[in-house]
Amino acid sequence: MSKVSGSNGGDSKNTLYCSFCGKSQHEVRKLIAGPTVFICDECVELCMDIIREENKSSMVKSRDGVPTPQDIIKVLDEYVIGQRQAKKILSVAVHNHYKRLAHASKNGEVELAKSNIMLVGPTGCGKTYLAQTLARIIDVPFTMADATTLTEAGYVGEDVENIILKLLQSADYNVERAQRGIVYIDEVDKISRKSDNPSITRDVSGEGVQQALLKIMEGTVASVPPQGGRKHPQQEFLQVDTTNILFICGGAFAGLDKIISARGEKTSIGFGATVKAQDDRRVGEVLRELEPEDLVKFGLIPEFIGRLPVLATLEDLDEDALIQILSEPKNALIKQYQRLFEMEDVELTFHEDALREIARKAIVRKTGARGLRSIMEKILLDTMFELPTLEGVREVVISEEVVRGSARPLYIYADRQEEKANASA
């Protein structure tokens, strides 16, 4: 039967060492004993990370040699909390995209159109993070572009061809690989038409960008300058066919929920008029009723929406979801800060009510999960400033009062822990 030795256990004359990293039992939290060997908790965690990475790389393939939607969503679940429907739509879309490419190479008679995706959801609900996570688990070139930096060709700003250049760079200038890649265009709501009425001035960063994106999203041979920047006649271009590139667009679309709610209202006047109560539903609930016509009213041109046939809406995050985001994912914020404190040989502990108060603050700020890090930084700033110069601190405890700003974090010193241990003995 294996025995487990704590980091404080054992006689000083018989110090035990990890058989893998060589650290002594006093340098680690736990040392697990087996037949003639020992392994520490740090090596166990390292082994678990290696196994997870191997499982990720050896995802079960379907008959077409493409990762199955179930396997894609399984990996997404490790990093992204909630948003089940959006994750399902993304995993199916990515699976179908590459199945379509495999099918096209086998049969030239039937041509399957690609289904680009539009992600709609409030700020901080995970749109960008979903796309970033997809990039890590899908072995194809991937790039992210910010729609706010794009302008119509001939004006100051980035050309839409620069998006393809970034994809080409992520593929190490392998044109064949780049032509099977994924492009995520963020902040696409910021290129909406500035006005419903035609104007005598050109809208070079709004409707003009939408028009410029149409061809590369549908499929065209783009001439990409290998060094980037503006084109000039003496420059050689790389030809990239965008027909098989999957485009995912995302945006917060602030105010879109009001357009959707107004569509369902019936206006009437007079004594018999129906008085409709104010829509008290959360933004995410209203967005479930999204129709393409709502995006047209918001300011996207019909041709642009037509290139994005798959609409996926994301929920705004409630208190419980934010608490899960803080503590549960593989790279959760709490785990990141605990790792930072471990570098100072200090254990960082959060009370449950402290996590709940952090989530409440993020909801009040209306920044979703994006606001969690700034709240954590503010809470831990003084502690991280003082800790490197303090001696003997073994644990820092964060309570609800600390999050509210009415108390300071509790510092627990090593000598007090020893006193408690002696008293209990």
Swiss-Prot record:
Provide the GO MF annotations for this entry. ATP binding; ATP hydrolysis activity; ATP-dependent protein folding chaperone; protein dimerization activity; unfolded protein binding; zinc ion binding
Give a Pfam family name. Answer: ClpB_D2-small
Matching InterPro entries: AAA+_ATPase (IPR003593), ATP-dep_Clp_protease_ClpX (IPR050052), ATPase_AAA_core (IPR003959), Clp_ATPase_C (IPR019489), Clp_protease_ATP-bd_su_ClpX (IPR004487), ClpX_bact (IPR046425), P-loop_NTPase (IPR027417), Znf_CppX_C4 (IPR010603)
Q: Provide the alphabetized UniProt keywords.
A: ATP-binding, Chaperone, Metal-binding, Nucleotide-binding, Zinc
Record: residues binding ATP: 122-129
Which PROSITE patterns does the protein's record reference?
A: CLPX_ZB
Where does this protein hold Zn(2+)? 18, 21, 40, 43
Please list the GO biological process terms of this entry.
cell division; proteolysis involved in protein catabolic process
GO cellular component terms given for this protein: HslUV protease complex
Ranges of residues in domain ClpX-type ZB: 6-59
Q: Which domain of life is it from?
A: Bacteria
- Entries under SUPFAM superfamilies matching the protein: Glucocorticoid receptor-like (DNA-binding domain), P-loop containing nucleoside triphosphate hydrolases
Q: Which CDD domains match?
A: RecA-like_ClpX
Q: How does it assemble?
A: Component of the ClpX-ClpP complex. Forms a hexameric ring that, in the presence of ATP, binds to fourteen ClpP subunits assembled into a disk-like structure with a central cavity, resembling the structure of eukaryotic proteasomes.
* Sequence similarity: Belongs to the ClpX chaperone family.
According to its UniProt entry, the function of this protein is described as: ATP-dependent specificity component of the Clp protease. It directs the protease to specific substrates. Can perform chaperone functions in the absence of ClpP.
The record's listing under HAMAP family reads:
ClpX
PANTHER family in alphabetical order = ATP-DEPENDENT CLP PROTEASE ATP-BINDING SUBUNIT CLPX-LIKE, MITOCHONDRIAL (PTHR48102:SF7), ATP-DEPENDENT CLP PROTEASE ATP-BINDING SUBUNIT CLPX-LIKE, MITOCHONDRIAL-RELATED (PTHR48102)
Q: What is this protein called?
A: ATP-dependent Clp protease ATP-binding subunit ClpX
